[in-house]
Amino acid sequence: VLDCSPNIMRGERFLPLSSLLEYLITGQASVERTIASVLYLLEQDGRQWNYEVFRKLGIPEKLFGPLSEPGRPNGSITRSFAAGAGIAGVPVISVAGHDTESALMAAPGLDKTKVFVSLGTSFIFGARVKAPVVNRESFHDRFKNMRGVGGTYSLCKDFPGFWILERCMEQWRKQVPRLDYEAVCAAAE
């Protein structure tokens, strides 16, 4: 990692976008647990960073600070951020930084008996599970464990590239207005 990105040593802290925005508002530098879980840098149970992975990849451990929980207070709005709006000191509640988990929290009736599909930059198919699923089958079939709100977990299968396919379809339909996915799949075969 360091050979490819020597500037990583100059960094003070790694913050995904949702955590960076919270830092700019509160001054608290932490990474929210649901977004951390999809980086593949947490222990399988999603409770802490996997420092063994950092060491093997040559990633400085100092970049990865505390984890925060969604739905819990994580600092207050700073005076400098409030800048005269009269909201300095108002508590900030962390949200699920991973967009799929935020969407799942709004899905009515989602429990361990139902599956979900999330469409965004990728296509995610999954189900709530009691604990992370760690076995040869899930690894072989490329399933991932996603940490959720309140200690929940989802076993998910990612189908990346949905956004790319949509952009391609947009361009192709300029030339062939009625182009559909079936025709694209047939041409790909």
Task: Describe the role of every protein-language-model region.
Residues 25-30, 77-80, 105-109, 127-132, ...:
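Short acidic, glycine/serine/threonine-rich loops at helix termini
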Residues 11-13, 32-42, 116-122, 176-188:
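Short alpha-helical "patches" and their helix-cap loops
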Residues 1-98:
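Gly/Ser/Thr-rich active-site cleft segment
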Residues 37-39, 98-102, 119-124, 144-152, ...:
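Conserved A3 ("GATE") glycine/threonine-rich loop of ANL adenylate-forming enzymes
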Residues 14, 92-100, 104, 114-118, ...:
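Short glycine-aspartate micro-motif
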Residues 9-12, 36, 62-63, 87-90, ...:
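Short coil/turn connectors at secondary-structure junctions
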Residues 2-5, 10, 27-28, 54-56, ...:
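A short helix-loop
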Residues 1, 25, 41, 103-107, ...:
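Buried hydrophobic packing segments
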